A protein has these predicted regions:
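An N-terminally biased module of ancient metal coordination in phosphate/nucleic-acid-related enzymes
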Residues: 1-79
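Extended substrate/RNA-proximal surfaces in nucleic-acid metabolism proteins
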Residues: 53-114
């Protein structure tokens, strides 16, 4: 049997486990391939990969990108999440994710102010 989970989150975004704990939980469930797809960040990837080096599990780089899609005919906007796998840690991606991080921080600040 070959266990795969291609959509997971650590506490770096909205999960509850550290990247290392997430890898260990996957191992406990006999998962052999795991993608860490935190929201708008790849900051936990290195930690997951480092932990996985001593274990029998493959880590796939990934990210869940928050986006907006607008329907021109109704002028409505919809939140869309795009799971991207096998992401390379290159400058254009880093810039985009840093921008996303700023947008998420501003959104969190606005939500907090409304409480």
């Amino acid at each position: 049997m070959f266990g795969v989970d291609l959509h997971t989150h650590s506490f770096i975004s909205d999960g509850t486990l550290s990247p290392e704990q997430l890898v260990q939980a996957a191992l406990d469930l006999k998962i052999q391939t795991l993608a860490l797809t935190d929201h708008d960040t790849m900051d936990g990837l290195e930690r997951a990969q480092d932990y996985a080096q001593d274990h029998d599990i493959k880590i796939i780089s990934g990210v869940e990108i928050s986006s907006q899609w607008s329907r021109p005919s109704t002028k409505k906007s919809y939140g869309v999440h795009i799971v991207a796998l096998n992401m390379q840690d290159e400058v254009p991606i880093k810039v985009m994710l840093e921008n996303q991080k700023k947008v998420r921080a501003e959104r969190a600040k606005l939500i907090f102010e409304l409480l």
